[in-house]
Design a protein with these regions (language model features):
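Second-shell loop/turn segments in exported
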Residues: 44-47
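N-terminal secretory signal peptides that target proteins for export/translocation
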Residues: 1-2
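Bacterial N-terminal signal peptides
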Residues: 5-15
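SH3-family beta-barrel domains
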Residues: 21-41, 52-56, 63-78, 82-107, ...
């Protein structure tokens, strides 16, 4: 009887979780899922398109939730409304700052340099610790200073 009850509770938890995933506490990080994403001036398809993103994986900060819409802030600080289903909970980041920065073999300033990346490069964000983050661009990855990434750390 207890096993059946636990199984039922587990099943109910699985069914309820996707609905709650859309109601996360803001702010939180997300990435652009679609090949093309319209940012609107309000939370409806009736509002004017203010900007079109054409960069899957671009990190955004979700700052407000309204039904199927999310108010986002992009790396340039621009804000607008997008359809929630076109965002992914996957973590990504974009290289910021001036000039190239290094992707290193290990999370240490004196670790060998594997690659150099330019500001504006978008990649997948891994774990961050002690000011360093795992960062992958295509099939190339390494460790990069957290301060050179927008999309890392607390939103």
């Amino acid at each position: 009887m207890i096993v059946r009850l636990l199984s039922l509770v587990s099943l109910l938890a699985l069914l309820v979780t996707p609905a709650h995933a859309q109601d996360r506490e803001v702010p939180y990080w997300a990435t652009v899922r679609a090949k093309e994403l319209n940012m609107r001036v309000g939370p409806s398809a009736d509002y004017k398109v203010d900007w079109v993103y054409r960069r899957p994986g671009l990190p955004v900060k979700v700052i407000r939730v309204m039904e199927g819409w999310r108010l986002i802030q992009d790396p340039d600080g621009d804000k607008g409304w997008v359809v929630a289903r076109l965002l992914s909970p996957d973590r990504g980041a974009i290289v910021v700052g001036k000039g190239q920065t290094e992707l290193r073999l290990d999370p240490e300033a004196d670790a060998p340099v594997k690659w150099r990346v330019e500001p504006g490069v978008v990649g997948t964000l891994g774990d961050c610790d002690d000011g360093w983050c795992e960062f992958t661009v295509g099939n190339r990855g390494g460790w990069i200073l957290e301060k050179r990434l927008w999309g890392a750390g607390e939103p």
